Amino acid sequence: MSVWALGLNHHTAPLDLRGRFAFAIDQIEPTLRGLRASLARQPEATLLSTCNRTEIYCAGDTNDLDSTMEWLAHNGGVSPSLLRAHAYTLQDDQAARHAFRVASGLDSMVLGEPQILGQMKDAVRAAEDAGAMGTTLHQLFQRSFAVAKEVRTSTEIGAHSISMAAAAVRLAGQLFEDLGDIKVLFVGAGEMIDLAATHFAAKNPKAMAIANRSLDRGEKLASRFGAEVMRLGDLPGRLHEFDAVISCTASTLPIIGLGAVERALKRRKHRPMFMVDLAVPRDIEPEVKELSDIYLYTVDDLAHVVQTGRDSRQAAVAEAEVIIDAGVQNFMHWLDQRGSVPLIQQLNAQADAWRAAEIVRAKKLLARGESIEEVLEAMSRGLTQKMLHGAMAELHAGDASSREATARTVSKLFLRGQMPRAATERKER
């Protein structure tokens, strides 16, 4: 059994390229079905897609990295060569190590951030719903979650970390003297917007509003913060009312365009606007950043802010890597053992067939009036002969060196490793 992974993340690919490979959670099931149908042996598969990474994990009898890469490139509308220039490919122990590091927050833009673990669990559930999970990937991810839990409870990896949402508040505080005097608009109602709204609400802004495609979901989030709710369609006409705009939706196209922002600035008489686009692909057209009085930040722009305290946690990183190393070794040991499962199943089936045949024979003997002692003797002798026949035949076949190797194997299996005395004496002479 082989395990492989490939992907691209904030370390290897720019934001706009990552945006081509972003999948909403409700897209994962059909996407996985398409992936598996495109591969010859339909391996187990899981797809993880966040604002900072898109990764595919597969497990199958044979490694199919090249075909997986070609499928992903086609799905994103780019050439395989372009994707390879920005992607990473990992196999077996390296794939397992990467999964464990991702789950533990060691590969995140925000070192030790906990959100990635929930995102991985969502990805696993989606793969299960798609019928794409099997024993191997189930083990890989359950062990990833266990390792992540141990890392978080045994180390200080998450101490003093700054989330994207907290970084947005910090940057807003550098632009506005008092966050209590501003009006904040949140576009979307997902987990990232929930976190951002929580952090901004702690600063008691003058007003908060949530614009979302689904009013029900928007109202549910808004009720926690005493915020106003509006439809996405109302956003262009009301954009000028807000000093800060935080956006993170699953839209595949920008929902805040250059023209809308230009009109908002004009109505604001060019009072500055703070905008954070946490979405991948982008929610806000990149040209907006060129406007005077607009301070637009993307997830990649926030990277330097969230690095605060990273150096002071290098000891925790080293401790986490030790835990991860042990987890990788245990997983690879389990994976190696899995290679023997088909043979074990065949041996059990063969032994059951022999047993069934001897029982049939014994019943016939009993029906003919044979004594129980004689029937038991015949049955046990028959089973013994069947079990030893193959080994006996191999011991008489081949040249001397092959017979000696066979003798060692047979003694290990049937004599607990003790070589017969005659064979030992021949070896000593």
Curated annotation (Swiss-Prot):
Enzyme class: oxidoreductase
Gene3D superfamilies in the cross-refs: Glutamyl-tRNA reductase, N-terminal domain, NAD(P)-binding Rossmann-like Domain
Alphabetical list of SUPFAM superfamilies matching this protein: Glutamyl tRNA-reductase catalytic, N-terminal domain, Glutamyl tRNA-reductase dimerization domain, NAD(P)-binding Rossmann-fold domains
Annotated residues for binding of substrate: T50, C51, N52, R53, S108, E113, P114, Q115, Q119
Coiled-coil intervals, chain numbering: none
Biological pathway: Porphyrin-containing compound metabolism; protoporphyrin-IX biosynthesis; 5-aminolevulinate from L-glutamyl-tRNA(Glu): step 1/2
InterPro entries: 4pyrrol_synth_GluRdtase, 4pyrrol_synth_GluRdtase_dimer, 4pyrrol_synth_GluRdtase_N, GluRdtase_CS, GluRdtase_dimer_dom_sf, GluRdtase_N_sf, NAD(P)-bd_dom_sf, Shikm_DH/Glu-tRNA_Rdtase
Record-annotated site: Important for activity: H98
Keywords attached to this entry: NADP, Oxidoreductase, Porphyrin biosynthesis
Gene Ontology annotations of biological process type: protoporphyrinogen IX biosynthetic process from glutamate
Catalytic activity from the UniProt record: (S)-4-amino-5-oxopentanoate + tRNA(Glu) + NADP(+) = L-glutamyl-tRNA(Glu) + NADPH + H(+)
Function: Catalyzes the NADPH-dependent reduction of glutamyl-tRNA(Glu) to glutamate 1-semialdehyde (GSA).
Comment field on protein domains: Possesses an unusual extended V-shaped dimeric structure with each monomer consisting of three distinct domains arranged along a curved 'spinal' alpha-helix. The N-terminal catalytic domain specifically recognizes the glutamate moiety of the substrate. The second domain is the NADPH-binding domain, and the third C-terminal domain is responsible for dimerization.
Subunit-level organization: Homodimer.
Similarity remark: Belongs to the glutamyl-tRNA reductase family.
Miscellaneous note of the record: During catalysis, the active site Cys acts as a nucleophile attacking the alpha-carbonyl group of tRNA-bound glutamate with the formation of a thioester intermediate between enzyme and glutamate, and the concomitant release of tRNA(Glu). The thioester intermediate is finally reduced by direct hydride transfer from NADPH, to form the product GSA.
UniProt protein name: Glutamyl-tRNA reductase
Species in which this protein is naturally found: Polaromonas naphthalenivorans (strain CJ2)
